């Protein structure tokens, strides 16, 4: 994968400016799996090949009409090139079947206008609208957005915001093919997933270097792609592929509160503490509400760092940084042991009627870094030692059947990543 871009800003005068950006992103994924029988005969089980290239053009003009009225209007044009050929065997040692195939290009075009209006010295109103269309299937959306902020004291503010947002799915979803439909892409007419967002915000300036925010929110999703009469929803997608017919009949609901306490960098010290308490539910194709895969219920982060100026003239910098996370455990569905034993490949089967009803214990994750920066007149050298997931916290990847013990066990794995880096700036 890779990305690059260039940006240009032009000032017509003190009140009007135009910003234009050209960018390109590239992603390629190749994967194969081979299955073996008891005689060590092999057969291909999975063959995934897909690449996506996006050319993105964005331009926006910002105009300050007065001290209390500013407007920003812009467009984004994304040219999406795709090439995918994805095959999967229904069972081990069976011939692979085509599940998604497509090659070509399409366009995602969006435009927006947003205005900031100073109603008074304490109250600011932001209103706007966003529109977008996907030419692949002519799906379109018109999304009103508005927010109001009341600075009712020098240290305290209150804000309320509402907006409608829409998104397209990953490109492979639109080109799913099934054995019963032949070359027809069964999901090509899928519409956008849409959502209403409402957020409150209370901000309090504790001091010149410290700020606190409390932000309750509510999100209602609709037109979510799901499998009819099933608990499946794309909101829980974590596989590299989708192989089923989807319909825009699902829903989702997120409600929670975010609390943030932040000390800005001052005298070499900074820190931030965040706490999120939330509930995340989805409504599947079987018309039942359940926990989403991501409903951890809480996440607490503490991060901070300290910088010391050292050296003969105090021009060099030694720094220590850390991040600690405590979050609810991974969600999973109970294993259907009978169905697993009946499966010819002993592939673990789950009780999808109770999808994501189980939860592992909370997770404790730590990261830290130590750095030293040498500053010279025309060049600087920075050395750093970093460690990600220092505590070796294990993530959940599913369950597997152990043929030696005839037992089903969860697959857990920890990715701890220490590294040493050097950066040269001139």
Task: Please provide the spans of the model-predicted regions.
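Gram-negative outer-membrane beta-barrel transporters
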Residues: 218-220, 241, 245-329
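Surface-exposed extracellular loop regions of Gram-negative outer-membrane beta-barrel proteins
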Residues: 28-30, 83-90, 135, 155-198, ...
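Outer-membrane beta-barrel channels and translocator barrels
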Residues: 13-15, 62-68, 120-124, 151-155, ...
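Residues on the lipid-exposed face of transmembrane beta-strands in outer-membrane beta-barrel proteins
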Residues: 6-10, 57-63, 111-117, 146-150, ...
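C-terminal beta-signal and adjacent terminal beta-strands/loops
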Residues: 271, 313, 325-347, 361-365, ...
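Outer membrane beta-barrel strand-and-loop segments of large Gram-negative receptors
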Residues: 54-56, 60, 99-112, 187, ...
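Extracellular loop and loop/strand-boundary signature of outer-membrane beta-barrel proteins
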Residues: 1-7, 41-48, 56, 60, ...
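Face-selective signature of the C-terminal outer-membrane beta-barrel domain
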Residues: 2-138, 151, 206, 210-213, ...
């Amino acid at each position: 994968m890779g990305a690059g871009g260039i940006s240009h800003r032009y000032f017509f005068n003190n009140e009007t400016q135009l910003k234009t950006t050209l960018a390109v992103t590239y992603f390629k994924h190749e994967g194969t799996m081979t299955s073996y029988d008891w005689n060590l005969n092999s057969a291909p089980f999975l063959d995934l090949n897909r690449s996506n290239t996006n050319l993105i053009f964005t331009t926006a003009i910002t105009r300050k009409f007065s001290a209390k009225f500013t407007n920003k209007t812009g467009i984004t044009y994304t040219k999406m090139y795709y090439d995918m050929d994805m095959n999967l065997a229904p069972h081990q040692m069976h011939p692979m079947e085509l599940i998604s195939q497509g090659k070509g290009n399409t366009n995602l075009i969006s435009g927006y206008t947003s205005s900031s209006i100073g109603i008074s010295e304490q109250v600011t109103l932001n209103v706007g609208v966003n529109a977008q269309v996907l030419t692949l299937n002519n799906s379109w959306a018109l999304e009103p957005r508005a927010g109001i902020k009341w600075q009712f004291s020098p240290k305290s503010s209150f804000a309320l915001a509402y907006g409608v947002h829409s998104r397209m799915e990953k490109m492979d979803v639109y080109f799913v093919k099934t054995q019963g439909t032949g070359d027809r892409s069964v999901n090509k007419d899928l519409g956008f997933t849409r959502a209403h967002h409402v957020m409150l915000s209370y901000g309090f300036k504790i001091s010149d270097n410290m700020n606190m925010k409390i932000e309750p929110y509510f999100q209602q999703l609709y037109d979510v792609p799901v499998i009819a009469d099933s608990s499946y929803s794309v909101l829980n997608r974590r596989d590299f592929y989708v192989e089923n017919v989807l319909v825009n009949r699902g829903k989702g609901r997120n409600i929670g509160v975010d609390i943030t306490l932040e000390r800005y960098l001052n005298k070499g010290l900074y820190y931030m503490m965040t706490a999120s308490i939330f509930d995340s539910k989805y409504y599947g194709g079987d018309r039942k509400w359940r926990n989403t895969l991501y409903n951890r219920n809480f996440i607490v982060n503490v991060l901070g760092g300290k910088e010391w100026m050292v050296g003969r003239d105090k021009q060099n910098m030694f720094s220590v940084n850390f991040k600690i996370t405590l979050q609810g455990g991974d969600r999973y569905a109970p294993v259907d042991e009978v169905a697993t034993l009946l499966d010819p490949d002993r592939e673990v089967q789950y009780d999808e009627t109770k999808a994501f009803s189980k939860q592992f214990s909370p997770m404790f994750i730590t990261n830290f870094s130590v750095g030293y920066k040498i500053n010279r007149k025309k060049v600087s050298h920075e050395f750093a030692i970093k460690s990600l997931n220092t505590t070796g916290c294990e993530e959940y990847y599913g369950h597997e059947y152990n043929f030696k013990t005839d037992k089903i066990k969860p697959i857990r794995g920890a990715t701890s990543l220490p590294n040493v880096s050097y950066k040269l700036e001139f």
